[in-house]
Amino acid sequence: MKVFEFLKGKRGAMGIGTLIIFIAMVLVAAVAAAVLINTSGFLQQKAMATGKESTEQVASGLMCIGVTGHYDKTLGGIDKLAIYITPNAGSAPIDLKNAKLFLIYDGESHVLNYSTVTTATLGADDIFNSSAITDWSLADSSSYVVGVIQDADGSLSNGVINKGDIAVLLVNANAVFNKAIPTRSEVSGQFQPEFGAPAVIQFTTPAAYTQTVIELQ
């Protein structure tokens, strides 16, 4: 009986004030839910973008597929280098205009920047023929020239290398090192793009120069 009397004395909260409080609680909950949904969506997009960037960083890059040198009998060594590069499998397009060529020889490190691109190398009988490939003159002590070897979509004309492309870096070794490279000399370095793995360059010149064009790597 006492229980019933106690409950009988209690009245439920009623009125417009209670309704306002209830609506306010619902609105607060709705706003909180919207904030959580927006935050989770933003974080998901951020994670996807970061994952894509990480994948590009890992997969993208360049590889060196060969290095040849030109022997100048008058200078007594290799005066020009042709460094052949191509993108790694799955690589994103790479802008060669922002790439740096690092070369180490005779205890000195040299950094070369992009100069220009030439299509005169397409189908050239001699990549070292400076008469046919006049842009060799733009390869100096601080710059390299990009030559087009294979470029189906014409992207290399703008300095961009992508899937299936092959380019050659024309380097005036005599100007860079202030002398031609003699026999039994070690040269190393890398061609570093703006992002991704670099193309590694490593070779030692032969004990004797018997030909004008020599395969080095």
UniProtKB/Swiss-Prot annotation:
Q: Name one GO cellular component term.
A: archaeal-type flagellum
Cell compartments where the protein resides:
Archaeal flagellum
Q: Which GO terms describe its biological process?
A: archaeal or bacterial-type flagellum-dependent cell motility
Q: Which domain of life, per UniProt?
A: Archaea
Q: State which gene encodes it.
A: flaB1
- Residue span(s) of the pro-peptide: 1-12
UniProt keywords, alphabetically: Archaeal flagellum
| Originating organism | Methanocaldococcus jannaschii (strain ATCC 43067 / DSM 2661 / JAL-1 / JCM 10045 / NBRC 100440) (Methanococcus jannaschii)
Provide the family line: Belongs to the archaeal flagellin family.
Instruction: Spell out the protein name for this chain.
Output: Flagellin B1
What is this protein for, i.e. what is its function? Flagellin is the subunit protein which polymerizes to form the filaments of archaeal flagella.
Chain ranges passing through the membrane: none
Question: What GO molecular function annotations does the UniProt record carry, in alphabetical order?
Answer: structural molecule activity
